[in-house]
Amino acid sequence: MQLGMVGLGRMGANLVRRLMRDGHDCVVFDVNPESVRQLESEGATGSNSLADFASKLSKPRAGWVMVPAALTGRVIDELAEQMEPGDIIIDGGNSYYRDDVDRAAELKEKGLHFVDVGTSGGVFGFERGFCLMIGGEKDVVEHLDPLFKTIAPGVESAPRTPDRTGPPSPAENGYLHCGPNGAGHFVKMVHNGIEYGIMASYAEGLNILNKANVGKKQGEISAEITPLREPQYYMYDINVPEVAEVWRRGSVVASWLLDLTAHALFLSPDLSDFQGRVSDSGEGRWTVGAAVDEGVPALVLSAALFERFSSRGEAIFADRLLSAMRKEFGGHIELGPGTS
């Protein structure tokens, strides 16, 4: 089957490579000509503009857009100008699901089909496959099924759930038609919100282990210094990288994310290579917003999002104000840096 790919960054290029490895025909375009040439050398058909790109696709044409979120809307609009009724535009980035609903309606007026695909797998997707969460018209999604099946990890990527019998479902192969337009990115949005929460849990737990020797610190015990009492119970020099390593094997909290965490700690045990300013790409905010709209408690996901804000210095004014208030009502003086 043929697919056109617009955007040849790490994920876009690896999607193309995975498709070509399975015998699919790929037409590619990127604003960076070198990215196009690289995939041409691997067997793709290159193009030098969106018009050239569209002209090299067989009808009904399917064009997958995989560009940074800020550019997605503009690129889809420009690609739509080159497409004809019956053609399909796929958004495989991290777009807001509400934009998908509006975009699908706009494209439908032009006779174009729209499919939103939440794509998870990152830089490891070529080897591991990409988990796909899909939104769109049922018949259009079914038409694209051979592409999704190739891109997805496959049923062998995880042990089968106990008591499931019969032929493996698409979900067991790593891709799922979640519903109409917007459903794919809605599910991916919540996936990323959960990711924030899991990451925060690992970070907080391992930080508690990292501070388990706080009782060895010399100093006067007061309400300003931890531990407040019984320092003899906090004398442990825990090897945090090795804890992450042992948890990978047979523990309840084992996961691929923990595998990556263990690798990061092995490379930089004290994490001195990082400043700790944690970005958020939007999905966490959208997830919390959806929880508010639905009236659904999302305490962990909300806290994980707000911690990312704090890591970037967004709480500095509030923290200073807390110190100022303590000084006002109790005469408390701030301790110097490095005091805990």
Segments predicted by a language model, with ranges:
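NAD(P)-dependent Rossmann-like dehydrogenase/reductase catalytic/cofactor-binding core
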Residues: M1-L8, R17, K59, K149, ...
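NAD(P)+-binding Rossmann beta1-loop-alpha1 motif at the extreme N-terminus of oxidoreductases
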Residues: M1-R61, G86, V123-F126, K327, ...
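Hydrophobic beta-strand scaffold residues
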Residues: C26, G46, I89, F114-V115, ...
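Short beta-strand and adjoining strand-loop segment in the mid-core
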Residues: V27, E127-A152, K188-Y196
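Beta-loop-alpha module in the N-terminal Rossmann-like domain of NAD(P)-dependent dehydrogenases
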Residues: A51, G63-L79, Y96-D99
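Short, well-ordered coil/turn residues at beta-beta hairpins
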Residues: V65-V67, G92, T150
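Rossmann-fold NAD(P)-binding glycine/threonine-rich loop
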Residues: P85-I88, G92-V141
